[in-house]
From Swiss-Prot:
Transmembrane segments: 8-28, 37-57
Protein name (database record): Uncharacterized membrane protein YozV
Gene: yozV
Organism: Bacillus subtilis (strain 168)
Membrane topology, from the record: Multi-pass membrane protein
Annotated keywords: Cell membrane, Membrane, Transmembrane, Transmembrane helix
Length: 79
């Protein structure tokens, strides 16, 4: 079963733990999360995560749901 991802939780994880890619693991993007961990020593993932933090906060709930909660709503429509 797929759980619904929360936009605010994703934004907070990106802000506080973004350099390690924790928000990517939360959103189900495991491959990207591993890349963040591999390159965390460069500081680049921290910069990208801060940009993603801003995008999460400024983006619409519908856009977030389309991108990260697609499978959740697909399962709900089948039930």
């Amino acid at each position: 079963m797929v759980s619904k991802k929360n936009k605010i939780v994703a934004a907070l994880l990106a802000f506080f733990f973004g350099g390690l890619g924790i928000h990517k693991f939360y959103l189900g993007r495991v491959g990207q999360g591993i890349l963040y961990i591999l390159f965390c020593w460069t500081g680049i993932p921290s910069i990208i995560a801060f940009i993603e933090f801003i995008i999460f906060l400024c983006g619409s709930e519908e856009g977030f749901d389309q991108k990260y909660n697609f499978y959740y709503f697909q399962q709900q429509s089948k039930a």
